[in-house]
Amino acid sequence: QFGATHAAPADVNGDGKIDILATRGHGVGVMWFEAPNWKQHMIDDTIDSTHSTDFGDIDGDGDIDMSTVGYESKLAVWYENDGRGHFTRHVLSRDQMAYDTMITDLDGDGHMDILVAGQRSQNVVWFENPQK
């Protein structure tokens, strides 16, 4: 089992405690660790080489969602949180050999978009949030 290459603090399950979201850049999986005992919860055990993650309220429901990219999987994805730490995967692209992702309101419309930097795909891609 490979260790995490990226970690980010966030209240994942809405209990007021800061948990840790983590990715395995040299292995498979995206997970979160629940405070205060740091119990591991697997979010996705199929995505490969997830070098970065970001979190924010992508779907506008008030909880923490996350985005990541799987370099070897060629995936750009975001995970919808139900507010209790259970996640549903949404695939944005199946052709992104990327290392970095960022959640930001790129167009200023009040909805969080996802930005992906593709190293081998040699691109920067903006995935606009479809909420209006």
List where the protein language model places each region.
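Beta-propeller blade repeat segments, especially FG-GAP/WD-type strand-to-loop junctions
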Residues: V28-H41, L75-T88, N123-K132
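Loop/turn-rich, solvent-exposed surfaces of beta-rich toroidal or solenoidal domains
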Residues: S52-F55, D63-V77
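Blade-level signature of beta-propeller repeat domains, shared across WD40, Kelch, NHL, RCC1
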Residues: Y99-K132
